């Protein structure tokens, strides 16, 4: 796999992960304003974590001799309903992991990038499982009980 393809994939991650971090921070503040303190804290931490990955991916682009771009981001939706948000975030994780699996396969000959992406993949997979678990919990205990747990 050429450095150009790896750099392009890392740049895609930088742009989209920065967007996700912004989205998670905004959702955190929306949830805090509504009194959903546990969700607010979770997504604030998640935004910080994602920014850390953005920094690592930027550094790797530079290590590979690439040029980092500050690309336009598409507009994202802000959710008022926490359950709608969890469903949306879960789908983003599912779709992202499918794409990331292909990127991992492409990066297998660049062990440093591969290892970085593998750590990120595991983290995103954990987030996906959390979202799925929350939706299962809502089915078991009901919406109101789940919402009460988020306060």
Set out the residue ranges of the language-model regions.
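Iron-associated oxidoreductase/ferritin-like identity signal
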Residues: 1-151
């Amino acid at each position: 796999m050429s450095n150009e393809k790896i750099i392009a994939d890392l740049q895609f991650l930088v742009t989209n992960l920065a967007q996700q971090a912004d989205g998670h921070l905004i959702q955190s503040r929306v949830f805090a304003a509504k009194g959903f303190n546990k969700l607010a804290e979770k997504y604030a931490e998640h935004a910080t974590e994602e920014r850390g990955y953005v920094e690592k991916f930027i550094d790797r682009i530079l290590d590979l001799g690439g040029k980092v771009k500050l690309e336009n981001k598409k507009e994202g939706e802000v959710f008022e309903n926490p359950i709608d948000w969890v469903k949306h975030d879960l789908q983003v994780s599912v779709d992202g992991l499918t794409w990331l699996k292909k990127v991992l396969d492409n990066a297998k000959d660049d062990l440093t990038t591969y290892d970085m992406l593998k750590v990120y993949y595991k983290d995103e997979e954990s987030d996906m499982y959390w979202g799925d678990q929350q939706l299962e919990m809502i089915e078991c205990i009901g919406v109101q009980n789940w919402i009460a747990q988020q306060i």
